[in-house]
Design a protein with these regions (language model features):
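Short loop->beta transition adjacent to catalytic acidic/histidine clusters or analogous donor-positioning motifs
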Residues: 4-7, 28-39, 47, 60-63
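Conserved nucleotide-sugar donor-binding catalytic segment
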Residues: 9, 82, 99, 143-222
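Short, well-formed alpha-helical segments that are part of the catalytic scaffolds
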Residues: 15-29
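Acidic helix N-cap motif at the loop->helix transition within catalytic regions
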Residues: 21, 46-54, 101
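A conserved acidic beta->alpha catalytic loop
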Residues: 41-50, 69, 93
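Glycine-rich, basic loop-to-helix element that forms the pyrophosphate-binding segment
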Residues: 67-84, 97
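Short aromatic/hydrophobic "clamp" motif used to bind/position activated sugar donors
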Residues: 89
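Conserved donor NDP-sugar-binding/catalytic core segment of glycosyltransferases
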Residues: 101-135
Length: 274
């Protein structure tokens, strides 16, 4: 039997034809090549399947799975996690871009710091054309060696996309994964933070695309409630959960039993003026 690649990349997607090919080019062109890319197509109705099949024929590292029906946003994210075979895992989006050395820098950081559970990098927002519009600031003390400090900071000090970092698969699987509510990634971030410190690579290597169709914390703040859980009729159930409720779910005993006690310029974009 062929040995599993060390890293599994999960890419859940629904109707992603506008940006998917560009994102796949950035992932498949990484300097770190020892990975399998698992794409879960959530019953897309556009050209997503054709794009995946085309790239799958060109690169054997791609494993394409099409869901027979739409299973919902968060269940599709959880599905790619269940398919992970590597000791490391990274979640990706079909519309984002990645600098060529992103994976290598994060994997190297995990190798150099065995106590770290996630390695991520500085992040920038890009527009629909791939131009950098904003360099994001990180305020969360996720690198603290003290679990209580990490926990407090994640609840109170900010929002960072650590769930898009490279993480240890066994640690991720000790969490409850993504719930069907807004800020589910913040919940899982906090669970991961209880298990160990995070490492931030001090370079802008991850480029998040901001566009009208994107489901993100930014759309929540402008009053948009997306449909995240599949219902009996195949439609979704709209759920909005505030930060306080999400944080409360983490602090309940059922959420902490799984956690051990504590022991630039883009290749495709341009910098904004100023």
């Amino acid at each position: 039997m062929r040995a599993a690649p060390r890293l599994t990349i999960g890419l859940p997607v629904y109707n992603g034809e506008n940006y998917l090919a560009e994102s796949l080019e950035a992932l498949l062109g990484q300097s770190y090549e020892e990975f399998q890319l698992v794409i879960s197509d959530n019953a897309s109705t556009d050209g997503t399947a054709d794009i995946c099949h085309r790239y799958g024929k060109q690169d054997s590292r791609i494993r394409y799975i099409r869901q027979p029906r739409n299973i919902g946003l968060q269940p599709n994210h959880n599905f790619v996690i269940t398919q992970a075979r590597g000791e490391l895992f990274k979640m990706t989006s079909h519309d984002d871009l990645y600098a060529r050395d992103l994976l290598k820098r994060c994997v190297d950081a995990l190798d150099e710091h065995p106590e770290v559970v996630i390695a991520h990098c500085w992040e920038a927002m890009i527009d629909t054309s791939g131009n950098v519009t904003k360099l994001l600031q990180y305020s969360v003390a996720a690198d603290s060696p003290r679990a209580p400090e990490r926990f407090r900071s994640m609840l109170l000090d900010g929002w960072d996309d650590y769930t898009y970092g490279v993480m240890r698969t066994k640690v991720l699987r000790r969490t409850r994964l993504h719930g069907s509510h807004h800020f589910a990634d913040r919940t899982i971030n906090t669970e991961l933070g209880l298990q160990g410190p995070f490492h931030m690579v001090p370079d802008w290597l991850y480029f998040r695309r901001d566009h009208p169709e994107r489901t993100s914390p930014y759309t929540v703040r402008t009053g948009v409630c997306t449909w995240t859980r599949a219902g009996r009729t195949g439609c979704g159930t709209p759920l909005c959960v505030c930060t306080a409720s999400t944080s409360g779910a983490i602090s309940r005993p059922s959420g902490t039993r799984r956690c051990p006690p504590p022991t630039a310029k883009s290749a495709t974009g341009t910098w904004p003026d100023g």
